[in-house]
Design a protein with these regions (language model features):
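Terminal targeting signals and extreme-terminal segments of soluble enzymes
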Residues: 1-167
Length: 167
C-alpha cells in the first residue's frame, strides 16, 4: 500500500504514522482489510509499547441495515488483540533455537460487548492491551472506537505454542 493510499484511508494529517499491517500475510485479513497499524509510542518496539490498529469501513463490511457487521467487528478485534499478544510473546521471549519452531497463538476465548453502531466510510480503531501473561496464556482487552465514540469492548485469551516447520 503506497503512502498516498494510506493517507486516503486514515484521518487527515496522520498518514505518516500508519502502515499496512500484513506481517503474517494472512489472506483472510488481506481480503477483508486493509488493516493498518501504528506504534503509539514511535518506532521503539517493546513489550509495553502499545499498537493501534485501524480500518476504514466499507460497504462490503456492512449488513443489510447499513451498519458494519458485528461479525466483522469481532474479527477485527480478534486480529488486533491476537497480533498484540503475539508481539508481546515474541518480544518478551528469547529467539527460538533452530528446529524449535515459530511462536504462534490460538484463540481460547473471545468476548465482545457492542456499544454503538458504525456505518460505511468511518475510521475505526482498536488499541489492545495485554494485561496478563502466564507461561502458556496471554490475556488481552480493548475498546473499538470511531473517534471518541466507543463501538465495542472486547477481551480474549490466547494460548501460545510453537509451529513446527513442515518438512
Amino acid at each position: 500500500m503506497s503512502k498516498q493510499e494510506i493517507e486516503a484511508v486514515v484521518p487527515a494529517g496522520e498518514g505518516e504514522r500508519w502502515s499496512l499491517y500484513d506481517e503474517w500475510h494472512d489472506p483472510f485479513e488481506h481480503k477483508n482489510g486493509p488493516i493498518l497499524c501504528r506504534d503509539l509510542e514511535g518506532d521503539a518496539a517493546s513489550v509495553t509499547t502499545p499498537l493501534e490498529f485501524g480500518f476504514r469501513s466499507q460497504d462490503d463490511h456492512c449488513n443489510v441495515a447499513g451498519a458494519v457487521h458485528g461479525g466483522w467487528l469481532l474479527t477485527f478485534a480478534d486480529v488486533c488483540m491476537a497480533n498484540s499478544a503475539l508481539r508481546c510473546l515474541t518480544l518478551a521471549s528469547p529467539a527460538p533455537q533452530p528446529g524449535q519452531g515459530t511462536p504462534s497463538l490460538c484463540t481460547i476465548s473471545l468476548h465482545m460487548d457492542f456499544a454503538d453502531r458504525v456505518g460505511p466510510g468511518k475510521w475505526v480503531t482498536c488499541a489492545p492491551e495485554v494485561y496478563k501473561r502466564t507461561k502458556t496464556h496471554l490475556f488481552v482487552r480493548s475498546l473499538g472506537k470511531q473517534g471518541d465514540r466507543v463501538l465495542f469492548s472486547a477481551s480474549a485469551s490466547y494460548r501460545s505454542f510453537l509451529i513446527q516447520a513442515m518438512l
